[in-house]
Amino acid sequence: MSSGCRSVGGSTWGNWRGDGGDLRQRRVLSPVCSAPAAGSWIGSQLGNVGNLLATPHPLGKPASSRVGTIVLACLLLFGSCVVRAVPTTPSPPTSTPTSMSTHSHGTVDPTLLPTETPDPLRLAVRESGILAEDGDFYTCPPPTGSTVVRIEPPRTCPKFDLGRNFTEGIAVIFKENIAPYKFRANVYYKDIVVTRVWKGYSHTSLSDRYNDRVPVSVEEIFGLIDSKGKCSSKAEYLRDNIMHHAYHDDEDEVELDLVPSKFATPGARAWQTTNDTTSYVGWMPWRHYTSTSVNCIVEEVEARSVYPYDSFALSTGDIVYASPFYGLRAAARIEHNSYAQERFRQVEGYRPRDLDSKLQAEEPVTKNFITTPHVTVSWNWTEKKVEACTLTKWKEVDELVRDEFRGSYRFTIRSISSTFISNTTQFKLESAPLTECVSKEAKEAIDSIYKKQYESTHVFSGDVEYYLARGGFLIAFRPMLSNELARLYLNELVRSNRTYDLKNLLNPNANNNNNTTRRRRSLLSVPEPQPTQDGVHREQILHRLHKRAVEATAGTDSSNVTAKQLELIKTTSSIEFAMLQFAYDHIQSHVNEMLSRIATAWCTLQNKERTLWNEMVKINPSAIVSATLDERVAARVLGDVIAITHCAKIEGNVYLQNSMRSMDSNTCYSRPPVTFTITKNANNRGSIEGQLGEENEIFTERKLIEPCALNQKRYFKFGKEYVYYENYTFVRKVPPTEIEVISTYVELNLTLLEDREFLPLEVYTRAELEDTGLLDYSEIQRRNQLHALRFYDIDSVVNVDNTAVIMQGIASFFKGLGKVGEAVGTLVLGAAGAVVSTVSGIASFLNNPFGGLAIGLLVIAGLVAAFFAYRYVMQIRSNPMKALYPITTKALKNKAKTSYGQNEEDDGSDFDEAKLEEAREMIKYMSMVSALEKQEKKAIKKNSGVGLIASNVSKLALRRRGPKYTRLQQNDTMENEKMV
């Protein structure tokens, strides 16, 4: 193509006006036109005109002034140019971004204007671009000044401040006293046991038993128990409006010594007069016998009473329905008492006796005595305000911080990780009952802690203050100041000459706590009027009203406020809420401090950056304003304000050209040229040529140029990826992951919360909870069981048939063996029953009085028979002949002699000695025969051969032993002599 054709083509393509109204110049078409024909002067001249038009005017005039000249040249030389047909629509780009597409020629674009001729080179360049596959592109029109903005002036940054008034000090925390009031009491009573026993012929059984406790009279306590350590065996008691009398062992009244009891619990002592009960059984059967036992018992036990102290209980299980603080004094008369006045007695200067040591107390006491229907109770009277207290000390805190926050005080205790909240007004101890002990214990504990830890470093800045915290905890707090801070305060007071205001300066909250209240007016404050003659009626009315007020005040007794008018402080059983409050306050303080410091630092940083923004907006206003507004805008500085226009998002396609070179061989584009459409599905007529800006911004002009340089390398962001150009020619796409990122953000380094462990705390221990009731039931059960063991001989009255139990056990055993075993068991049990019955009969006979008498007589008869038998045996041993044959005695012999006419004085020489010797031998033989028979019987019984042999040998020996038997004479010599 000739140069003229190039000029016409270039002029025709470059005469399109954009939104800015400037004529766009295209120099990329000249290299692709055909070379002009040789000798074509007009073409060469038009080429020169084209080059002239392509060169920028030195004066900067717009190309519109030369439009007429260019149009005229084109009309004259139009026929010398060869026009090539182009396709109606450009083919879509191939899948490869860098590939060049080919199109057919010879087709005219119907969308062109009638006067516009399609240029195939222009379409070829357009189709050689790279389509942006993803990403958002924007186009920004130039600002005209219709919308202007300004940068905000610097702000005033907040200062970090907690906004609290902290005060350190020492505190003592009190809780509700749920433990009962304990004291020692003495119980006096006499235990009466009346038994009725039935005596049968062979058995004795307990038919009835009556047991009762009766009180010991106060006079007997004075005269015997506390005076001598003894007690009377007589008991007087009123039952059913009848006065009854009982005597121990049914005998006359005597004084018995009180001895320590064998059975006593660890927390109590007891004394009694006897350990046995009397059970009398007479000798006559088939009748009842009644016996009485009186045991005087004195017990020293523990007594308990709980608020409102209108009764107290004893460890014996007895409950006294009277206040332990009741007495005859003025302040004690208002206490509760359910008994008649004659049952109560109070003794001043009483000295009780110790029944163990038998010594009286050295210090006298005020003793109260109450006589109930069953016992008499005595205890030492004390004043209620001194002994009883509804609050008790829970914790001593050596380091406490109090701060005021939103109209309340917060007491933080780090040692137990707890925070208590209370009102800013102090709590009056007079509004709670029985709190006199609080001030004393609090002062002692605080002074002790101060002397141990803070005496050399701190000074007190006020008196003890009392605050009622949530949960029912009373906090006794005394503020302190360090010595250094106290010196600063003193120097300030001396400098300002306000030494009289030292206390208020050291403790500024003291005035707020001591709120003055308006005194209520009453008729008592009005002096009693004196009657006058002028106003008698009015003075009488005032006199009556004043009198009624005095009577009402006297009846109410305002000096002694009852417990019903006061509110008892109730304490929760757990302080988990206080521990959670401490944790929340700790976290809140840390977070608030952190956020406050961040806010202050952030504000300071923004003020410093504002100066940088103000200077940077002069260099690149569009980028600065877009970053500030977080929106794509085009900006231009108009003096002290900035004109902006909002950028429009490109909905159509954006094509990136492969080359960044311009028509001038020495000039190149500094940013890649693009072709885009504003809307989707737009034809070639709606395509716009522009240039790729920063952050996917599309310029509608291609005015960013630079001199061409060697070894040029550029990376440009195109959509969501980057494109790489080398020597002003597209090379490839670069993913963002291949490019290393350097962060411009500043990391925010925050301090984490410190670790804090929650310690389990018990407001009331297990022992305290078990000790809250009036009665200790375990102590009662032990006492009752041991009390039953005091009379340990009761079981001796009741007989238990243990034989029947044994027989039943044997019968059960045999039944388990089957039918055969049951038959054998019946036989065995029958025989055993007979034996047992016999033995039982004998035992019953022996238990019977008549049986005992018969046994006694039999024993005596046996002894007499034994005596005579013993005498007979001794007689046989001394003179067996006389015992066995009394005829041989001397008396018979003398009688025989007398019958024959002989005198008693005759000599005994006439006695026949031979016969006497024969008699002796016969007796000896008889004894040996008797012994032999016994030996033979034993041998036969034992069935032993040795015994039989010995018996036979003895028989043989007896046969050979002794003189030979001689026959006696037929006639007696004496008879013969008499006959002569």
From Swiss-Prot:
Localization: Virion membrane; Host cell membrane; Host endosome membrane; Host Golgi apparatus membrane
Residues in the Intravirion compartment per record: 871-980
Keyword Transmembrane: yes
Disulfide bonds: 140-647, 157-603, 231-296, 389-437, 668-708
Signal peptide location: 1-86
Motif (Internalization motif): 965-968
This protein's UniProt keywords: Disulfide bond, Glycoprotein, Host cell membrane, Host endosome, Host Golgi apparatus, Host membrane, Host-virus interaction, Membrane, Signal, Transmembrane, Transmembrane helix, Viral attachment to host cell, Viral envelope protein, Virion, Virus entry into host cell
Stretches for region Hydrophobic membrane proximal region: 794-847, 823-843
Residue ranges of the motif Golgi targeting: 925-928
One GO location term (cellular component): host cell Golgi membrane
Role: Envelope glycoprotein that forms spikes at the surface of virion envelope. Essential for the initial attachment to heparan sulfate moieties of the host cell surface proteoglycans. Involved in fusion of viral and cellular membranes leading to virus entry into the host cell. Following initial binding to its host receptors, membrane fusion is mediated by the fusion machinery composed at least of gB and the heterodimer gH/gL. May be involved in the fusion between the virion envelope and the outer nuclear membrane during virion egress.
Protein name: Envelope glycoprotein B
Taxonomy of the source species: Viruses, Duplodnaviria, Heunggongvirae, Peploviricota, Herviviricetes
